[in-house]
Amino acid sequence: NLFLINVTKERNFSYGVWKNRQHIMINIKGGNHIGWGETKVSSNQPDFDMSAWSGQFKKLKGMMLGDAIEEVRNQFLAGNWKPIVTEGLLMTLYDLMGKIENKPTVKIWGLTGEAPVPGIFCILEREETMVVKQAQIAVDQNMHRYVKIKMFGDFELDKKNISALRKFLGPDSFIVGDPNQGYKHVKDLQKLSEIMIALNEAGMDAVEDPSNLSKEDLIYLQANVGKLSIIPDKIMRPASKSINYFDD
C-alpha cells in the first residue's frame, strides 16, 4: 500500500524554494506482520503520480522477503532504480523482517554498537525572526542540542541568522550550517576558509557542503578553518561508490 502526503510547509534553500514536497508512506504485508517505510519523492509537484512511480517495483509482489531485499539492492547498485525508490523500499522490507524475526534491524545486520544517535532539528528560513521562531520550537520539543540551519551563500545574511540562532540557543547547542554548496561562487579556497572561520566565530560549529569540493579541497579546507568541522554530504552519495573513493 502507498500513501501520498503533501507537505505544504515552505522550505528555503540556496538554490531555490520548495513551496511543497511529496512524501510517500509504504507498507508491505508478510504473514501477520506489516513493515512500514517512508521516502521523499518530489518537491513542488502536488499532483505527483504514485502509479507511475511505483510501476517499476511491482515485480516484488509475491517474492520471498530475502529475495525482495536482494532485488532492490541489485537494482540500486546497477543504477536502474534511484534512491527515492530504493531507500523507502529497503526501509519497509527491513522493518518487516525485523518484526517477523522479532529483532531490531541493527541486530539483523550484525551491528553491535548501541550508542545513541542524536536527531537534528532543521531550520530552513531566510528571515532572522523566523529562524528564532523555529529555534523556539526546537527548545519546546527538547531538540535544541543539535540544530541545522540552512544557509544561502550570502555571507551577511548567513552570519546574521547564525548569530541570532547562537544568541537564542546559548553556548551548549551544536549548530550545523548547510548552504547546499551555496558558496561555490567563491573560487579561492583560502577566501572560502576565511568566510567559514568568520561564520564559526558567529556561532557555527560545523558546515555541510559549503561549496562544490573535491576530496582534496575538503582536506585543505578542514586544515585551514581551525576548530570548525567540515562535513561532506553530496560527495558521499551513493555510499556504494564513495566508500572506495574515500578509502584511497
Describe the residue ranges of each PLM region.
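Catalytic beta/alpha-barrel core
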Residues: 124, 146-155, 176, 180, ...
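Glycine/Thr-rich phosphate-binding loops of Rossmann-like dinucleotide-binding domains
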Residues: 217
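Short, charged, surface-exposed secondary-structure boundary motifs
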Residues: 132, 239-244
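Short acidic, glycine/serine/threonine-rich loops at helix termini
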Residues: 188-189, 220
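N-terminal capping/lid subdomain adjacent to the active-site entrance of alpha/beta enzymes
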Residues: 1-184, 190-200
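Short, surface-exposed basic-aromatic patches at helix termini and helix-loop junctions that form
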Residues: 167, 222-226, 246-247
